[in-house]
Swiss-Prot record:
GO CC entries: plasma membrane
Subunit structure: Homodimer. Forms a membrane-associated complex with FtsX.
Gene Ontology MF terms: ATP binding; ATP hydrolysis activity; transmembrane transporter activity
Keywords: ATP-binding, Cell cycle, Cell division, Cell inner membrane, Cell membrane, Membrane, Nucleotide-binding
Organism: Haemophilus influenzae (strain ATCC 51907 / DSM 11121 / KW20 / Rd)
Name recorded for this polypeptide: Cell division ATP-binding protein FtsE
Binding residues for ATP: 36-43
Membrane topology listed for this record: Peripheral membrane protein
Family note: Belongs to the ABC transporter superfamily.
Xref: InterPro entries: AAA+_ATPase (IPR003593), ABC_transporter-like_ATP-bd (IPR003439), ABC_transporter-like_CS (IPR017871), ABC_transpr_LolD-like (IPR015854), Cell_div_FtsE (IPR005286), P-loop_NTPase (IPR027417)
SMART domains: AAA
Length: 218
């Protein structure tokens, strides 16, 4: 599914690389934690997989294709195979929950009626069909995070990435979010979760990639 071969990334003006010489492989159907303190390089690694950043060295393979060589016209096709869950939700506050979830499909060219049907099915999977016509400010933080997850999976991605998805939630809500990720993984989705929530990792043990100052330690 995903393979990093000696991947490095440095930002202009930075005193040290964000990522240095990374080598790892995530097989199809795996669920893995990406662990590290703030600034360790977790978000940068996820952005490289999404094609939002370019590596300075090395190769990143996704389903047998080197994504470091993709053109700007090919990147959108890559992103349709990947879902991304954010810590800060990034929901449009003037659009209803179902409109937020359907929007990526409409942007990709799907008819709004079909996109709405798919969005409702995605909300079903996260238990929020009953909040479909609410605005994001009218629902709780935990529910907004579930909306972001519904949006991330609405296009049925092969790979789901999550960047600190429980950073703003209490332990009980965090556990519920991780249960959703486990459910998607059981259904065949490959999942990579960037987190520093050690307590939750201990409750839900999975293979870990540990980043420290841009280096992969384990």
């Amino acid at each position: 599914m995903i393979k990093f071969s000696n991947v490095s990334k440095a930002y202009h003006g930075a005193t040290q690389p964000a990522l240095q010489g990374l080598n790892f492989h995530l097989p199809v159907g795996s669920m893995t934690y990406l662990v590290g303190h703030s600034g360790a390089g977790k978000s940068t690694l996820l952005k490289l997989i999404m094609g939002m950043e370019k590596a300075n060295a090395g190769q990143i393979w996704f389903n047998g294709h080197d994504i470091t060589r993709l053109s700007k016209y090919e990147i959108p096709f890559l992103r349709r195979q990947i879902g991304m869950v954010h810590q800060d939700y990034r929901l449009l506050t003037d659009r209803t929950v179902v409109e937020n979830v359907a929007l990526p499909l409409i942007i990709a060219g799907m008819h709004p009626k079909d996109a709405n049907t798919r969005a409702m099915a995605s909300l079903d999977r996260v238990g929020l069909r009953n909040k479909a016509h609410y605005l994001p400010p009218q629902i709780s933080g935990g529910e907004q995070q579930r909306v972001d997850i519904a949006r991330a999976i609405v296009h049925k991605p092969q790979l789901l990435l999550a960047d600190e998805p429980t950073g703003n939630l209490d332990d009980e809500l965090s556990l519920g979010i991780f249960n959703l990720f486990e459910e998607f993984n059981r259904l065949g989705m490959t999942v990579l979760i960037a987190t520093h929530d050690i307590n939750l990792i201990q409750q839900k043990p999975k293979p870990c990639l540990v980043l420290e100052q841009g280096y992969l330690r384990y």
